[in-house]
């Protein structure tokens, strides 16, 4: 970090409080912009004359794109070029948002959703690690750098305590901002037309690009070799294809009468073949895309299970929204307003978890 300006990633004239505020506010478009918005799904379906399965499918496509990012985490955060990555990411999300606002093709909408899910995770992690460095002067990526693991039990215990304190705070931060973004898009869809959600988010992206241009200087890449190559994006594509095909079968199966529809049969065959090819490549390559072997660890399996339950029980999840809309006859704006109360629960639960972690419970 010695070669970087004192106020990295900003110019020296930017006050620290303003830099922290900019990095925090940039999370709102990062967490909110997507291929489709579930809070304006009713208006979108009536405006385009589409069925709810289309919105569900594209929502899952966004999640698949986010999952495809995971192996790129360390390679991207060590690049340490906030301005370049944010400008590229926000610009691509702007173009994809415009396509989603104008297109009536479900295939194109799903493709854009996968790409936007991947870009969302890229921008989220890059901005998070930069915020931690700028606000706390902590190089968070060193905590996940291979070769820097603790060498004794005391070191592992200290690392576990640090993670158990930091992770609830990070989850609390993201979930509150995510709920605020959901409320914002629900209000826009309620007050205006559903297309205005896309246009408003595109405006937010342009504001972010302008702020980055004004407040952040250009930094050269420090290493001679770029840590990412195109072959890894091929692996990510092969990871996404079977999941998207499987999602297509599960979402559209009932509507299209399952195996009587040729697209369902084709999607199922494609999912099986590409899934088998993916696992074959993962088992034979010296540096696999996903370290499937980590699932042998009990702590990893328990973590995946608890995170799944967390997302399943989250009040902003799709299942709860559907229940509130059909069972309680609430519109999307009322549903989002009701969901705002979950932020209080997020805060209470996060504070309790952090307190217990500090007490080494």
Model-derived features: where do they sit?
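Interfacial helix-cap and linker-helix signal at transmembrane-aqueous boundaries
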Residues: 44-45, 59, 76-78, 183-193, ...
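Central cavity-lining transmembrane alpha-helices of secondary-active solute carriers
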Residues: 57-75, 124-128, 340-353
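Helix-loop-helix hairpins in multi-pass membrane proteins, especially solute transporters
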Residues: 78-231
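Cytosolic juxtamembrane N-terminal segment immediately preceding the first transmembrane helix
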Residues: 1-33, 39-42, 46
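Glycine/proline-centered helix-kink
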Residues: 38, 174-187, 243, 318, ...
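Extracellular/periplasmic helix-loop-helix junction of adjacent transmembrane segments
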Residues: 38-69
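Hydrophobic transmembrane-helix bundles of small-molecule transporters
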Residues: 190-305
């Amino acid at each position: 970090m010695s070669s970087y300006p004192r106020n990295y990633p900003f110019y020296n004239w930017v006050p620290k409080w303003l830099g922290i505020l900019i990095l925090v506010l940039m999370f709102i478009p990062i967490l909110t912009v997507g291929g489709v918005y579930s809070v304006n799904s009713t208006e979108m379906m009536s405006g385009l004359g589409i069925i709810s399965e289309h919105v569900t499918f594209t929502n899952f496509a966004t999640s698949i794109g986010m999952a495809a990012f995971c192996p790129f985490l360390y390679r991207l955060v060590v690049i340490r070029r906030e301005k370049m990555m944010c400008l590229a990411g926000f610009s691509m999300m702007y173009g994809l948002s415009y396509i989603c606002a104008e297109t009536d093709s479900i295939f194109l909408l799903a493709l854009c959703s996968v790409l936007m899910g991947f870009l969302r995770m890229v921008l989220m992690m890059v901005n998070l690690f930069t915020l931690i460095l700028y606000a706390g002067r902590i190089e968070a990526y060193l905590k996940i750098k291979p070769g820097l693991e603790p060498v004794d039990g005391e070191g592992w215990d200290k690392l576990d305590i640090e993670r158990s304190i930091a992770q609830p705070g990070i989850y609390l931060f993201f979930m509150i901002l995510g709920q605020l973004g959901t409320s914002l898009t629900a209000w826009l869809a309620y007050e205006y037309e559903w297309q205005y959600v896309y246009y408003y988010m595109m405006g937010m992206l342009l504001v972010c690009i302008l702020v980055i241009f004004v407040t952040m200087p250009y930094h050269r890449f420090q290493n001679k070799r770029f840590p990412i190559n195109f072959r890894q994006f091929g692996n990510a594509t092969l990871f996404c294809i079977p999941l998207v095909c499987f999602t297509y079968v599960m979402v559209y199966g009932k509507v299209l009468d399952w195996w009587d529809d040729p697209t369902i049969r084709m999607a199922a065959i494609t999912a099986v073949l590409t899934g088998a090819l993916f696992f074959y490549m993962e088992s034979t390559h010296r540096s696999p895309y996903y370290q499937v072997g980590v699932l042998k660890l009990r702590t990893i399996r328990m973590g995946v299970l608890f995170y799944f339950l967390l997302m399943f029980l989250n009040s902003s999840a799709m299942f709860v929204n559907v229940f509130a809309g059909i069972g309680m006859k609430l519109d999307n704006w009322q549903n989002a307003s009701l969901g705002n109360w979950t932020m209080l629960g997020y805060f209470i639960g996060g504070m309790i978890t952090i307190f217990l972690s500090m007490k080494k419970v």
